[in-house]
Amino acid sequence: MAITKDDILEAVGAMSVMELNDLVKAFEEKFGVSAAAMAVAAAPGAGGAAAAEEKTEFNVILAEVGSNKVGVIKAVREITGLGLKEAKDLVDGAPKPVKEGVDKATADDAKKKLEDAGAKVDVK
């Protein structure tokens, strides 16, 4: 009579933690595999859906300059490190991205500085 999958599951279910540990070690030695590598490899698949839903890179887009153009240019220079002419060209060309591919904290900080200067900003 052959051992079925259900027989194996029943036997494993009846084992103590120490016996299961010994069984895992025996599998590792017999088949040349590592249970730790399997657990690590399985983890990204399990959390993949949650990671895909949470966005990690953001773009800060200057939508409208507002009435305080000079203040917005100063804020753009501070955020990007651009020179005066480059910052002015960016502001004159709104809507344009100010920062791309930044983390949430950086995007929020840039948005606050630009809004404080009177601009309308989108974070996408």
Swiss-Prot record:
* Pfam families, per the entry: Ribosomal_L12 (PF00542), Ribosomal_L12_N (PF16320)
Question: What's a Gene Ontology MF term here?
Answer: mRNA binding
Decide whether keyword Nucleotidyltransferase is in the record: no
What Gene3D superfamilies does the record tag this protein with? 3.30.1390.10, Single helix bin
Q: Which GO terms describe its cellular component?
A: cytosolic large ribosomal subunit
What superkingdom heads the lineage? Bacteria
Please give the function described in this protein's UniProt entry.
Forms part of the ribosomal stalk which helps the ribosome interact with GTP-bound translation factors. Is thus essential for accurate translation.
Q: How does it assemble?
A: Homodimer. Part of the ribosomal stalk of the 50S ribosomal subunit. Forms a multimeric L10(L12)X complex, where L10 forms an elongated spine to which 2 to 4 L12 dimers bind in a sequential fashion. Binds GTP-bound translation factors.
What's the protein called, per UniProt? Answer: Large ribosomal subunit protein bL12
